[in-house]
């Protein structure tokens, strides 16, 4: 079951410059990490006391999952991440609704206790969705 919006991902090759823009908008960095399965560095930003977060996604290594996106479309809106109670169950349910899985199975996310999987919403919407679940010991974002 989808519980809410966790974050909105922005693809950027320059997280420092993009972070300065977010700072000017009043956001502050709250946490971050590396999602090794995707080869990306993630920084999460938030308005004081408010969510959802804004995630800056940048390459952590050559041939990362984000490099093709940056090369083909440039920086910008990358995905919308929804918090779910069970990533595998949502993958199955959404496949049946016509979404195309990017990940065959869930992967570790950039935050502690975070499990993620990506799906593509076909046209006419045509955007990337991230399903996010947190272990019970991790802070729930919704």
Name each region found by the language model.
Residues 1-40, 64:
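Long, hydrophobic N-terminal alpha-helical segment
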Residues 5-12, 22, 45, 53-57, ...:
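Short, structured motif recognition centered on aromatic/hydrophobic residues
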Residues 12-20, 24-25, 32-34, 41-46, 52-54, 61, 69-142:
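Vicinal oxygen chelate
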Residues 40, 49-51, 72-77:
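Short connector loops at helix/strand junctions that flank enzyme active sites
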Residues 60-63, 135:
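Feature marks short, surface-exposed loop/turn motifs that line or immediately flank catalytic pockets
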Residues 63-68, 139-142:
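Short, surface-exposed linear segments at secondary-structure transitions and domain or protein termini
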């Amino acid at each position: 079951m989808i519980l809410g919006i966790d974050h909105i991902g922005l693809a950027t090759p320059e997280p420092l410059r993009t972070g300065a823009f977010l700072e000017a908008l009043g956001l502050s960095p709250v946490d971050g990490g590396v999602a090794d399965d995707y080869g990306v560095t993630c920084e999460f930003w938030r308005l004081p006391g408010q969510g959802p977060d804004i995630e800056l996604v940048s390459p952590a290594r050559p041939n990362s999952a984000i490099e093709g996106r940056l090369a083909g479309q440039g920086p910008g809106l990358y995905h919308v991440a929804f918090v779910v109670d069970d990533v595998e169950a949502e993958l199955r349910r959404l496949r049946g609704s016509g979404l195309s899985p990017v990940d065959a199975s869930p992967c570790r996310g950039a935050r502690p206790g975070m499990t993620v999987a990506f799906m593509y919403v076909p046209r006419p919407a045509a955007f990337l969705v991230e399903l996010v679940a947190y272990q019970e010991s991790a802070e729930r974002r919704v």
